[in-house]
């Protein structure tokens, strides 16, 4: 039978497991392809993409890819609180919350992560109202399709805890309480275009873009 394997992300461990279960090697990505996916999964790609998504006054978000001890220290000490992320991590793992002091522990953590992953992702803190994501499917030939929304929740540490099982329409209505629906549609269309250019021909499968609805005191948006 014709099989099309569609996991939520590939890595060496999954490839090894499927191969061990007798899966045809022709259906599995090569090690070279996995290396390419690792490159495109690096958070520095999101750092580069983020400025292109600032479509109007409803959008916020800053993210920096920092590579040196001096940059890490300056970023942490210039802010009352901030978040450092390992570039190759997800689901709320590989996070380090900082409160204005670049401690020896944080310094050591940054050094170890940068040695294996090239640098550190640094972001300011926001007053989060909702966690959500837009989900897409890339066909590998340049076409990226919007598949729907995901509304999820995380713990105090930022680690993923679970999803709310709602229809796309219900999630859309929930998010539209905070921002105009056109803002969501415009972002969806922008992401389809940007993701097609970025990964449309190098990746076949699902991908998601995590987002937040944030509140700012000056306008309560």
What does each model-found stretch correspond to?
Residues 1, 43-51, 69, 102-108, ...:
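Well-ordered, non-membrane alpha-helical segments in soluble/globular domains
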Residues 1-78, 89-90:
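Conserved N-proximal alpha/beta basic substrate-recognition cap immediately N-terminal to
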Residues 14-22, 93-96, 132-133, 216-220:
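A short acidic (Asp/Glu
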Residues 55-56, 80, 116-117, 199-203:
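Short secondary-structure junctions
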Residues 60-66, 75-97, 111-128:
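ATP-grasp fold ATP-binding core
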Residues 62-63, 82-107, 133, 156-175:
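Glycine-rich phosphate-binding loop of ATP-grasp-fold ATP-dependent ligases
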Residues 80, 103-161, 208, 212-221:
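Phosphate-binding site of ATP-dependent enzymes
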Residues 158-220:
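A long amphipathic alpha-helix within ATP-dependent nucleotide-binding catalytic cores
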């Amino acid at each position: 039978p014709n099989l099309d394997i569609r996991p939520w992300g590939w890595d060496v461990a999954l490839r090894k497991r499927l191969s061990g279960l007798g899966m045809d090697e022709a259906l599995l990505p090569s090690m070279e392809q996995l290396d390419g996916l690792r490159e495109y999964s690096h958070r520095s790609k999101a750092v580069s993409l983020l400025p292109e998504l600032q479509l109007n006054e409803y959008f916020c978000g800053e993210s920096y890819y920092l590579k040196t001890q001096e940059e890490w220290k300056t970023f942490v000490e210039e802010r009352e609180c901030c978040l450092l992320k390992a570039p190759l991590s997800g689901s709320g793992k590989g996070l380090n919350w900082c409160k204005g002091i670049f401690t020896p522990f944080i310094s050591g953590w940054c050094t170890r992560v940068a040695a294996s992953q090239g640098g550190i992702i640094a972001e300011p803190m926001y007053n989060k109202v909702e966690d959500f994501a837009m989900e897409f499917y890339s066909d590998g030939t340049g076409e990226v399709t919007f598949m729907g929304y995901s509304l999820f929740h995380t713990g105090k540490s930022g680690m993923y805890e679970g999803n709310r099982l709602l229809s796309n329409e219900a999630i859309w209505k929930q998010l539209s309480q905070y921002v105009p629906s056109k803002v969501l549609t415009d972002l969806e269309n922008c992401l389809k275009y940007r993701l097609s250019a970025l990964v449309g021909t190098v990746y076949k499968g699902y991908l998601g873009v995590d987002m937040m609805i944030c509140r700012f005191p000056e306008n309560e948006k």
